[in-house]
């Protein structure tokens, strides 16, 4: 219940922790929006769902949102209200799922409006994508973004990557997050590694950035 959730927030705060909510803008087939606003979703010409694919995965059980719908203004307002609702409940951190597969114009508009009223709110982009796409998300307002740190393993790879993040133009707008919380996207060493492997990786992340974890 919402009462339980608020208690959870309070308990986390007493322990010096911040609760982050995962925001995934997509819907189940039985969501009220599907019947009330069918134009908000992606459909094939034959009327079937134009579901997302990330080979070999096929997400056939969820409906992707059409950010360029002819009713986009109402859609965008409704999506923004999701953030506003949880901010009202006391949430200040959002980890956004796959933002690079959504409209960049939406993120720029949404985050700008949210931060105008709530500048303390943090947006983390869970984006495993091309560097330019990551940087575009940062320029669109995301506070932090996922990186390729997990896949840089040799001393040379790590040095080159950290130099790229700290000595190139991107340092002006991209704040990297070095430890992703997506288990199925970990490097092979971490997928099969023991406790010492993870501790070593975290110490390295904590040494190289102010935003690890």
PLM region descriptions:
Residues 1-10, 14-17, 27-213:
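Alpha-amylase-like alpha-glycosidases and glucanotransferases acting on alpha-linked glucans and related
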Residues 19-21:
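Carbohydrate-binding surfaces in secreted/extracellular proteins
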Residues 23-25:
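Active-site beta->alpha N-cap acidic-glycine motif
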């Amino acid at each position: 219940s919402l009462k339980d959730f608020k208690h959870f927030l309070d308990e986390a705060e007493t322990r010096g922790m911040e609760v982050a909510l995962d925001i995934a803008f997509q819907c189940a087939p039985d969501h009220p929006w599907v019947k009330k606003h069918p134009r908000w979703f992606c459909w094939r010409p034959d009327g079937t769902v134009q579901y997302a694919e990330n080979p070999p995965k096929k997400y056939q059980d969820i409906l992707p949102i059409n950010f360029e719908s002819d009713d986009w203004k109402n859609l965008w307002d409704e999506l923004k209200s999701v953030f506003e609702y949880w901010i009202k409940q006391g949430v200040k951190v959002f980890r956004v799922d796959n933002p690079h597969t959504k409209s960049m114009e939406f993120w720029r508009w949404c985050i700008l409006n949210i931060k105008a009223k709530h500048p303390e709110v943090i947006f983390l982009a869970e984006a495993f994508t091309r560097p330019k796409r990551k940087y575009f998300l940062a320029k669109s307002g995301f506070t932090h973004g996922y990186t390729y740190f997990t896949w840089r393993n040799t001393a040379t790879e790590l040095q080159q990557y950290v130099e790229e993040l700290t000595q190139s133009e991107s340092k002006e707008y991209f704040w990297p997050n070095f430890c992703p919380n997506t288990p199925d996207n970990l490097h092979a060493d971490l997928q099969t590694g023991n406790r010492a492997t993870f501790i070593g990786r975290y110490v390295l992340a904590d040494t190289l950035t102010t935003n690890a974890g």
